[in-house]
């Protein structure tokens, strides 16, 4: 699990280069710019577009960085 805020600041979306937000509940890193959610498995962020899921229309910017 990514608990260090500085670690999160270093990670960027591989598609847009934009910032990511952590969703602790779903264990995902969210790129609102790309509208993708990257999974975190066993504490490791999987930053591959092929592994990301598209965000649903009802998923809003409620997650904190």
Swiss-Prot record:
Transmembrane segments: none annotated. Pfam families: Trm112p. InterPro entries: Trm112-like. GO terms for cellular component: cytosol. SUPFAM superfamilies: Trm112p-like. PANTHER family: PROTEIN PREY, MITOCHONDRIAL, ZGC:162634. Belongs to the UPF0434 family. This is UPF0434 protein BQ10150. It comes from Bartonella quintana (strain Toulouse).
